Amino acid sequence: MTKKIVAIWAQDEEGVIGKENRLPWHLPAELQHFKETTLNHAILMGRVTFDGMGRRLLPKRETLILTRNPEEKIDGVATFQDVQSVLDWYQAQEKNLYIIGGKQIFQAFEPYLDEVIVTHIHARVEGDTYFPEELDLSLFETVSSKFYAKDEKNPYDFTIQYRKRKEV
């Protein structure tokens, strides 16, 4: 297996990715996809995103936090203060690294991304955090996508799009 750095996120039609440091929707099928994709790999997020998840660890995933606070110590979590230290850690690994947010973390890792996995929620929801416009998705070509219709458990239609970085 060739390891890779992948950004994975969900957004609504306006680019909303969060509200009050949480996901502003509940889509069990999308959460299941996230789980299956990231299982047995490493996930990286900012400390604010980790706080928004209630500081709970996701099972069978190595959790990495990027924080400005060098004193931040969290049981079961590897903490880093800068992008380069995360990249140095990654070089010694055999697993994928999934960048799961928030906005500043996506921006910081854009130059290093091999792939992106975007869930496009076909609705507009209320939110206060938007996916960074600075991240240039034109650098990535769509390789596949899968549509999910809303149902009794998932209140919105959504499409999961898989993109890989274009060859230069």
Swiss-Prot record:
Catalytic reaction equation(s): (6S)-5,6,7,8-tetrahydrofolate + NADP(+) = 7,8-dihydrofolate + NADPH + H(+)
A Pfam family this chain is assigned to: DHFR_1
Residues noted as binding NADP(+) in the record, renumbered to the chain: 9-10, 17-22, 46-49, 66-69, 83, 100-105
Pathway where it operates: Cofactor biosynthesis; tetrahydrofolate biosynthesis; 5,6,7,8-tetrahydrofolate from 7,8-dihydrofolate: step 1/1
Keywords (A to Z) from UniProt: Antibiotic resistance, NADP, One-carbon metabolism, Oxidoreductase, Trimethoprim resistance
EC annotation from Swiss-Prot or TrEMBL: 1.5.1.3
Any single Gene Ontology cellular-component annotation: cytosol
GO molecular function, one term: NADP binding
NADP recorded as keyword: yes
Record annotation: effect of changing residue 100 to L: In strain: 21, 30, 56 and 1/1
UniProt cross-references to SUPFAM superfamilies, sorted A to Z: Dihydrofolate reductase-like
Effect of residue 60 to Q: In strain: 30, 56 and 1/1
Outcome, altering residue 91 to H: In strain: 21
Binding site for substrate: 8-10, 30, 61, 119
Outcome, altering residue 65 to V: In strain: 92
Effect of residue 141 to D: In strain: 56
Effect of residue 20 to D: In strain: 21, 30 and 1/1
Effect of residue 111 to S: In strain: 56 and 1/1
GO biological process, one term: tetrahydrofolate biosynthetic process
Sequence ranges assigned to domain DHFR in this UniProt record: 4-165
Family of this protein: Belongs to the dihydrofolate reductase family.
Additional observations: Strains 1/1, 21, 30, 56 and 92 are trimethoprim resistant.
PANTHER family hit by this protein: DIHYDROFOLATE REDUCTASE
Function: Key enzyme in folate metabolism. Catalyzes an essential reaction for de novo glycine and purine synthesis, and for DNA precursor synthesis.
Protein's name according to its UniProt entry: Dihydrofolate reductase
